[in-house]
Amino acid sequence: MDNARMNSFLEYPILSSGDSGTCSARAYPSDHRITTFQSCAVSANSCGGDDRFLVGRGVQIGSPHHHHHHHHRHPQPATYQTSGNLGVSYSHSSCGPSYGSQNFSAPYSPYALNQEADVSGGYPQCAPAVYSGNLSSPMVQHHHHHQGYAGGAVGSPQYIHHSYGQEHQSLALATYNNSLSPLHASHQEACRSPASETSSPAQTFDWMKVKRNPPKTGKVGEYGYLGQPNAVRTNFTTKQLTELEKEFHFNKYLTRARRVEIAASLQLNETQVKIWFQNRRMKQKKREKEGLLPISPATPPGNDEKAEESSEKSSSSPCVPSPGSSTSDTLTTSH
């Protein structure tokens, strides 16, 4: 194998069941998905030098390979994360023309190969042979074993995994799907962590503890809503408006007694009559300013509230004629 340009086709000797000396090399790349190899129906004893497994994708490894056989036992977990199917072609020199070359496209099947291998002794028995790749090791010198192969003519091959690196670096187990990138894998691992499972319930902040007053609703009185800021506007009937306009034509300001009397006759409350007269006076002033109506000399502008307050006080106080007013009345009557 060329050390300058190496497609990482790692050759593994095949130990046939009958003769341990006649071995042919099977080349496997170090970057392919987990593959189950099926043995062909030829005798393992007749395997020549042309009996090879050729596997598709290779990686560029710049450092030479040093082959060492270690005679001690060590755990070798092997699972990898790969993408795409692996194309395996198998050809045998002793097979006839009718046999030809077989191509295997193995699906993705993540197995964890965790075995303890003793190179000097027997080899562990396992199910369909699984070799997994996608070795993401740096460009350092790789010390590896030749993986042994033992079995019959049609038996399932067994493999002993390499240990890469000068200190026999153990490869991490990849338990995620092949479609996930490392970023997504780390995100899923963070989501599956026990800290997220035992997350605290919703926190209560200070602004959530503030008690807000509910909106005020107007209380329904005898004739409608009373004295509330969000009181509904009173809709007066035509008869009520006619009587109020008639009273406004004679008296711009009402005494409390007269206001109670008008409210009782029109089926309104005292507050409604008072507010109607206030609005009517403001409307009158607006029209006078616009020149639509002549200025009424009854009360000077600006003294409306004083006149209304004085009328209320006079209506509430007992009607006791003063001595001056009585003398003035007698004088006017004598004249």
Swiss-Prot record:
Disulfide bonds: none
Presence of keyword Disulfide bond: no
One biological process term in Gene Ontology: regulation of behavior
Short sequence motif Antp-type hexapeptide: positions: 204-209
Matching Pfam families: Homeodomain (PF00046)
Region Interaction with OGT, residue ranges: 75-203
Gene3D superfamilies the record matches: Homeodomain-like (1.10.10.60)
DNA-binding region per UniProt: 229-288
Biased composition (Low complexity): 313-328
GO-annotated molecular function: DNA-binding transcription activator activity, RNA polymerase II-specific; DNA-binding transcription factor activity, RNA polymerase II-specific; identical protein binding; RNA polymerase II cis-regulatory region sequence-specific DNA binding; sequence-specific DNA binding; sequence-specific double-stranded DNA binding
Role: Sequence-specific transcription factor. Regulates multiple developmental processes including brainstem, inner and outer ear, abducens nerve and cardiovascular development and morphogenesis as well as cognition and behavior. Also part of a developmental regulatory system that provides cells with specific positional identities on the anterior-posterior axis. Acts on the anterior body structures. Seems to act in the maintenance and/or generation of hindbrain segments. Activates transcription in the presence of PBX1A and PKNOX1.
Subunit structure: Interacts with OGT (via TPR repeats domain); the interaction takes place mainly in the nucleus. Forms a DNA-binding heterodimer with transcription factor PBX1.
Protein name: Homeobox protein Hox-A1
Gene name linked to the record: HOXA1
